[in-house]
């Protein structure tokens, strides 16, 4: 077998392994202390976002709810996968626990960790999110990835969307973050 065929085979197997691992992790249950730790990390990630983008404090106060993923891990070598756990806040208090997963393929390489926040700006957007068996961005969901200006202000056109997504705190080497194709599902281990 030639070296290029071995490399291609390794890339395919690595991609499948990443995707399978993310899928298996999505089904893991969590104990009460682990949930408490997740809430603490989500509160800290929310504070980081408020510090980095001060306008998000008002956005959180005016939104029907918001979902914070304090740590989303993404890795890829041709095939990619990402996974994280998050907390839904309503009225500033934890109201549910969620997983985020994603898979992709193409010319990509790297690994990174980042935080992600989803603001549901209308009661209808939050109700739709809560009533579905999983939100998949890019599948008919009207959302905007926030464009934040140098002043920390959020663009007016972004504020008019029912779901606003922020990606922040990136660490690692990876060529960009793609939120389309991510799937968010409620955890059943509350």
Annotate each language-model stretch with its function.
Residues 1-26:
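N-terminal secretory signal peptides
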Residues 29-190:
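Small-residue-enriched, tightly packed secondary-structure blocks
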